[in-house]
Amino acid sequence: MANHFRTDRVGMEIKREVNEILQKKVRDPRVQGVTITDVQMLGDLSVAKVYYTILSNLASDNQKVQIGLEKATGTIKRELGRNLKLYKIPDLTFVKDESIEYGNKIDEMLRNLDKN
């Protein structure tokens, strides 16, 4: 049970740090406007699944952002190592967060129901 709290706490710290690193340290224009929405940690803290959103819904922009984040992974891990007191910095996997788009789709469906 205590391990669950640790993974949540480490995930929140990584989320905060990665957002800051993307704003201040990563100069790649492909990752401008990226917001980290959630980080899910593996139980042993070896892997962090980092969920992100972007302002654009274009597929080409999504692909560019994904490539930019993958290229910036080394820089992000290095900065995390400097800022966090962890024995081993987890491997980072970036995943586009679809929950906001899904929520918008549900809202639109509900509005359409109200009109009918």
From Swiss-Prot:
Keyword Cytoplasm attributed: yes
Gene3D superfamilies documented for this protein: 3.30.300.20
Localization terms from the record: Cytoplasm
Pfam families: RBFA
GO molecular function (one): ribosomal small subunit binding
Cross-referenced HAMAP family: RbfA
Major subcellular location class: cytoplasm
Keywords attached to this entry: Cytoplasm, Ribosome biogenesis
GO BP terms in the entry: maturation of SSU-rRNA
Quaternary structure (record): Monomer. Binds 30S ribosomal subunits, but not 50S ribosomal subunits or 70S ribosomes.
Superkingdom: Bacteria
Lineage of source species: Bacteria, Bacillati, Bacillota, Bacilli, Lactobacillales
Cystine residue pairs: none
Record-given protein name: Ribosome-binding factor A
